[in-house]
């Protein structure tokens, strides 16, 4: 495609210079640029394609950064980046080395007000900006998807909006989707509460008629979209009850109508809810047909067939830890006919789709409501029913009190399947799963473990149902280096606090958590080149530690290395030092983990080099710390 307009847009001021008639052409160029770039890098595709016209219209009518846009989940900000001076090589490398972040990032641009990686916070942040702002001429525009209304934080903020708040426009991008289809009463209610029951029934009849049209009519989805807009315009909306002036619904793919509507409401003296209807994946036929699979894509997605990220995918090599976990839960579901699985909007990412399909009555997606997911799971456990709450490490932070008060304090046997434990690499600082141990380890009654491979993962899941205590099974989103057995029994259950010696040596004791055991075994081989023999231990459990085994090993090992892909604060290293202190054991300990800094996005090799967790870096740090010889200066490898 020839780009006639986009190369000349270096700021919103350049956009303002265009005539209204040229905006549709610009939108086409932006949409093509996103598809072209993400076909090389991967990234969040469908949500950005659906928001092209809306974002262009917002920047055309308002003046960023004086007017402030706050995106609810910054992964829908690619168009915003292109319009604010970031249509550079860095955009072509988005989420990779030397590329832009996949989220809004103030360090990148003063047009990004907040770093936004988690959902549901935009309205609260925007209200805070409005409360503290001294610039009465500035507009504040939180931009929310309809899925954000399943998040309690959004509703709390909605409850606090002053009726006399001016120049405050809530933009509701209603595509009836989260990552997957919306769940729960509230997102569905945004549509159903908009118009009376009679109109709702009429809508169902019309949509049914459209679906029965011949398949060669490819515009069925567009026709359905226009019907939705027309019917919603007949109704009195829910949001008026919250003191908001409702405007909409507006066709989110008609940039001229969007501009005209925004110009009309720009200076109204009360808070406004601007309701826009869009189609997720708009402009790319495959993404429109299957917005779930095209929500986030891998590089070269146009040259390969996208595979479903579900539990029982074809047994291809390698299979990731989450895929193994999904398979194991399906097998557990067959063995334990009462087992319930709960997730906060991560059914697809955590490979739970097969469990959902096989056991729909025993699967609950609560939407973007992590606290509710945890406490809901606690209620299930209290009834005597086994339950697994599957949740990303980075999202578990949001439910810390629920874990403490509703699970651990009640001594309820909720199994937490903590996905994405470890570095997130391309998603960057908001998504790294490297902090959860800091609060989980402090909670009484909590058992915490991490497998090094699929076989240990399998044993931990099956064993956890026997422990009868709260437990957390952590695992990363990387290939597991061994296949699970795919059998029920017999298997050897693991008791909390059972570690495993992987190899024995005389000079060093290297304790490595989870998948870092692979790195530890490589380091052991490197150290052999220097005549150093190493005992490598997989602790399996962070809490409780295998005290008996450790005490035995420490009688003839005084040099110890702890290796983990977690913050050096509050993880395995901290637990081990506490163990030494409690037992009055003296040892020289080198604790290696993620340094106390926010880790940026980038390719795995780059990030591991940055933080010193490659096998070469680790070997050099061990040699330097224990003074086995004078190594290459460590500053060349690592800066904390």
From Swiss-Prot:
Q: What protein am I looking at?
A: 1-deoxy-D-xylulose-5-phosphate synthase
Q: What cellular-component terms does GO give this entry? A: cytosol
> What is the role of the protein in this entry?
Catalyzes the acyloin condensation reaction between C atoms 2 and 3 of pyruvate and glyceraldehyde 3-phosphate to yield 1-deoxy-D-xylulose-5-phosphate (DXP).
Provide the binding site for thiamine diphosphate. 75, 117-119, 147-148, 175, 370
Pathway info: Metabolic intermediate biosynthesis; 1-deoxy-D-xylulose 5-phosphate biosynthesis; 1-deoxy-D-xylulose 5-phosphate from D-glyceraldehyde 3-phosphate and pyruvate: step 1/1
Q: Which family does it belong to?
A: Belongs to the transketolase family. DXPS subfamily.
**Cofactor detail note:** Binds 1 Mg(2+) ion per subunit. Binds 1 thiamine pyrophosphate per subunit.
GO BP term (any one): thiamine biosynthetic process
Q: Which NCBIfam families match?
A: dxs (TIGR00204), PRK05444.2-2 (NF003933)
Q: What is its EC number?
A: 2.2.1.7
Q: What does the record give as cofactor?
A: Mg(2+); thiamine diphosphate
Q: What is catalyzed by this enzyme?
A: D-glyceraldehyde 3-phosphate + pyruvate + H(+) = 1-deoxy-D-xylulose 5-phosphate + CO2
Describe the protein's quaternary organization and the partners it interacts with: Homodimer.
The answer, when asked if Transferase is one of the entry's keywords, is yes
Q: Which Pfam families match?
A: DXP_synthase_N, Transket_pyr, Transketolase_C
**Residues binding Mg(2+):** 146, 175
